[in-house]
Amino acid sequence: MNIEELYRTYFDIVYRYIRSVSRDGALAEEVTQETFFKALKKADQFRGDCDVRVWLCQIAKNTLYDHLKKQKKQLSGEEQPETAESHGGEIFEEKLAQRSQAMEIHKVLHGLSEPYKEVFSLRTFGELNFREIGMLFGKSENWARVTYYRARVKIREELEHEDHM
């Protein structure tokens, strides 16, 4: 598979994964582009012992972490600016309610500890199967299933707790 095919086939998956972890569309775009650049440079190092998606998501995760470390050094203790996406047009109540619920889920998700947050994101947004997630972490498929299930339970409990407040 050449780089163009790789890019067309996996761009969306890598982008959605990084977007779900970072919650920043511009950053996700930048990291995804850099991921494919790194993948091109390191294509000869791909051993084929895991799915290409797993390999690309691992590169993307490391690239994101590198980017965040670099950004943290640049900000040197300053509060990181929040990014807000502007949405044009009229938003109907139903869409607003769905978005509000999605934001609540994202808030709870990003409050989870690792590896729950990442496993949930890889499964839900990165569309990786449990075997691939296990390989990414150097763990078993069963570990990935249990971790995902526990993340779902934690998210559900936190959302129910917030509803009762």
Protein language model annotation of sequence segments:
Residues 119-123:
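A short pre-motif secondary-structure segment
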Residues 11, 15, 36, 113, ...:
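C-terminal flanking helix
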Residues 45-47, 61-78, 98, 150:
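Arg/Lys-rich amphipathic alpha helix in sigma70-family domain 2
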Residues 131, 135-161:
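DNA-recognition helix of helix-turn-helix
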Residues 1-16:
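A short, charge-rich alpha-helical start-of-domain segment used by transcription regulators
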Residues 14, 18, 56, 60-68:
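Hydrophobic-face residues of short alpha-helical interaction/recognition segments
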